Swiss-Prot record:
Signal peptide: none annotated. InterPro entries: Ribosomal_uL11, Ribosomal_uL11_bac-typ, Ribosomal_uL11_C, Ribosomal_uL11_C_sf, Ribosomal_uL11_CS, Ribosomal_uL11_N, Ribosomal_uL11_N_sf. The keyword NAD does not apply. Keywords: Methylation, Ribonucleoprotein, Ribosomal protein, RNA-binding, rRNA-binding. One of its GO terms (biological process) is translation. GO terms for molecular function: large ribosomal subunit rRNA binding; structural constituent of ribosome. The keyword rRNA-binding applies. Forms part of the ribosomal stalk which helps the ribosome interact with GTP-bound translation factors. GO terms for cellular component: cytosolic large ribosomal subunit. CDD domains: Ribosomal_L11. It comes from Francisella tularensis subsp. tularensis (strain SCHU S4 / Schu 4). One or more lysine residues are methylated. This is Large ribosomal subunit protein uL11. Part of the ribosomal stalk of the 50S ribosomal subunit. Interacts with L10 and the large rRNA to form the base of the stalk. L10 forms an elongated spine to which L12 dimers bind in a sequential fashion forming a multimeric L10(L12)X complex.
């Protein structure tokens, strides 16, 4: 069987368990002729065990015959950091005002979740990547 030709790659961020045909999903998939409800049902089934509402980056490959496959990534580091320190948003002045403090243990936990999507060589490097994200959000980092 010949390999299908990829016609488009669509990158979206969709809330776990809450995919529906309304924007931004509907228009993004509709313009490529993808079965929108098919994607929504499949995505919601795969994210059933996850925390509802957690943003999940998804990469949808659309083939020339209008079929599709999708790959889910790990949640954004900023979401995981905000969840770990229980804040709604980062600081508007990151290096001057701090919204909270995060420990090395919390950073390690986030790094383990993000590991498949990070290019870090080891856990320590992954922790430093996550710590940098935390600092840029105005979170004080302890133990790194």
């Amino acid at each position: 069987m010949a390999k299908k030709k990829i016609e488009a790659i669509i990158k979206l961020q969709v809330a776990a368990g809450k995919a529906n045909p309304s924007p931004p999903i509907g228009p993004a998939l509709g313009q490529h002729g993808v079965n929108i409800m098919g994607f929504c049902k499949e995505f919601n089934a795969k994210t059933q065990g996850m925390e509802p509402g957690m943003p999940i980056p998804v990469e949808i490959s659309v083939y020339s015959d209008r079929s599709f496959t999708f790959e889910m990534k790990t949640p954004p580091a900023s979401y995981l950091i905000k969840k770990a320190i229980n804040v709604k948003s980062g600081s508007s002045k990151p290096s001057k005002e701090f919204v909270g403090t995060i420990t090395r243990a919390q950073l390690e936990e986030i790094a383990k979740v993000k590991d498949p999507d990070l290019t870090a060589a080891d856990l320590d490097a992954a922790v430093r990547i996550i710590a940098g994200s935390a600092r840029s959000m105005g979170v004080k980092v302890e133990g790194v």
